[in-house]
Amino acid sequence: MYIGSDFMKDKYLMINTSVLPDVFEKVIEAKELMKAGKIKEITEAVKVVGISRSTYYKYKDYVFNVSELSSNQKVIISVTLNHRPGTLSKILDKIALYKGNILTINQEIPIHNTANVNITFDISQLNIEFNRLLEEISAMDNVIKLDLIAMD
């Protein structure tokens, strides 16, 4: 859902829609029409809800229903690491410590002592705030960069 997030800078607020411009609700409505399969193309969805395509694309990755967020169970993170023994294992241990369930690990061959790893895991049973877990992983030794790639 959210591509290329810089979670360390992102801030999330829960706001009553009555104080927001209608455009945000319309973006959500367009997303829901597409997700439900009622409308197949974005052009049609934005026409039905009354917003422009550019408005839709501007906000689609930043506006969510609370119910949409609470249903997120799987996340994909991309981690760039210094290639050192035990680094990936420590990251996996950290996720497991807070009751994250590892689903897949995709690791590229290290080049110039740098490795890229994508980790998909279930966060439905996490006993720590998700952003806090990402901050802890990001602060670990040999972690160069961490990006949130997707939530589902």
Swiss-Prot record:
InterPro entries: ACT-like_dom_sf (IPR045865), ACT_dom (IPR002912), UPF0735_ACT_dom-cont (IPR008310). This is UPF0735 ACT domain-containing protein CTC_00116. It comes from the Bacteria. Residues 76-151 form the ACT domain. Belongs to the UPF0735 family. NCBIfam families: PRK04435.1. It comes from Clostridium tetani (strain Massachusetts / E88).
